């Protein structure tokens, strides 16, 4: 962890679902002290409620929140990000780091709305961040320095794994790891339904399916083996698994999942921000 990050002041603009997940992780792991977190929401009543609940400062004033911040985390929707950046631009200082988690919004879009030389990082976490098992990919704008990278790695490392990619790959990240949990939930749900169809109680079927998905993913990560090799190790000759795989192949599982990632990635590209 960068030595000074605990003492840095963090502004979180947009304390919605992901903003709240990140803020609570920062607090829980003492990456940023509660008294140094300033967040914003749209309504004063909600600001008061969240301030009382989490022990941080919450306001409806974006400019006030960023005034003394060292790090500004933009957690607002892509459709309003431009307005928010223009709102705070006049109060941004040279040594502040801007991190955006808005899908499809390039670093250049943010940079040209801020004073020249402001470091901007674009990140894409996913919802398993809620349980500390998230996957965040990030890329850097033109003015980002090494210490800024380390800050980003530290912050997003509180909610899971972190990887740096070239910005040209960020739309693919959106289609794969950001949207991916929804695909996995559908697969998990279908596995459990198959168990129910064969007579298992629903709660046990769901537990079996969830742990199977979790354990299989862990084997890929910890062994480093290609998924195809791990699959083949389960599919013994003339066994039950081969019959199951045949059904999946006939149903087009592989092609359907590939097309889902491609389609979601293409949709991310269509949301042009310039």
Report the location of each language-model feature.
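Small-residue helix-packing motif on alpha-helices
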Residues: 37, 47, 65, 201-208, ...
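A short glycine-threonine-serine/GTX helix/turn-capping micro-motif
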Residues: 173-182, 231
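Short acidic capping loops at alpha-helix termini that bridge into adjacent secondary structure
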Residues: 33-36, 94-96, 203
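NAD(P)+-binding Rossmann beta1-loop-alpha1 motif at the extreme N-terminus of oxidoreductases
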Residues: 1-53, 57-60, 64-68, 196-197
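Rossmann-like NAD(P)(H) cofactor-binding subdomain of soluble oxidoreductases
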Residues: 22, 43-45, 53-54, 62-67, ...
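NAD(P)-dependent Rossmann-like dehydrogenase/reductase catalytic/cofactor-binding core
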Residues: 2-6, 210-274
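Internal alpha-helical scaffold of NAD(P)-dependent oxidoreductase catalytic cores
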Residues: 109-119, 135-172, 185-222, 267
């Amino acid at each position: 962890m960068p030595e000074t990050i605990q003492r840095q002041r963090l502004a979180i603009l947009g304390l919605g679902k992901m903003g709240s997940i990140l803020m609570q992780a920062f607090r829980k792991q003492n990456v940023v002290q509660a008294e140094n977190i300033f967040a914003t929401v749209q309504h004063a009543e909600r600001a008061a409620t969240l301030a009382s609940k989490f022990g941080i400062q919450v306001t409806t004033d974006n400019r006030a929140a960023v005034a003394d911040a060292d790090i500004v985390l933009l957690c607002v929707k892509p459709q309003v990000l431009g307005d928010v950046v223009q709102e705070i631009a006049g109060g941004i200082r040279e040594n502040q780091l801007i991190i955006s988690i808005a899908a499809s919004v390039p670093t250049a879009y943010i940079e040209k709305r801020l004073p020249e030389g402001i470091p901007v990082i674009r990140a894409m976490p996913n919802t398993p961040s809620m349980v500390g098992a998230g996957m965040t990919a990030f890329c850097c704008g033109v003015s980002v320095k090494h210490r800024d990278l380390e800050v980003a790695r530290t912050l997003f490392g509180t909610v899971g794994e972190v990887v740096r990619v070239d910005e040209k790959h960020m739309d693919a990240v959106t289609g794969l790891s950001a949207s991916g949990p929804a695909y996995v939930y559908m697969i998990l749900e279908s596995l459990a339904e198959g168990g129910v169809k064969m007579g298992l109680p629903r709660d046990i079927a769901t537990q079996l399916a969830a742990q199977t998905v979790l354990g299989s993913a862990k084997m890929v990560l910890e062994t480093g083996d290609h998924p195809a090799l791990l699959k083949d190790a389960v599919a013994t000759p003339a066994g039950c698994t081969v019959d199951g795989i045949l059904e999946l192949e006939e149903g087009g599982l592989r092609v359907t999942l590939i097309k889902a990632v491609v389609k979601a990635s293409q949709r991310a590209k269509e949301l042009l921000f310039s």
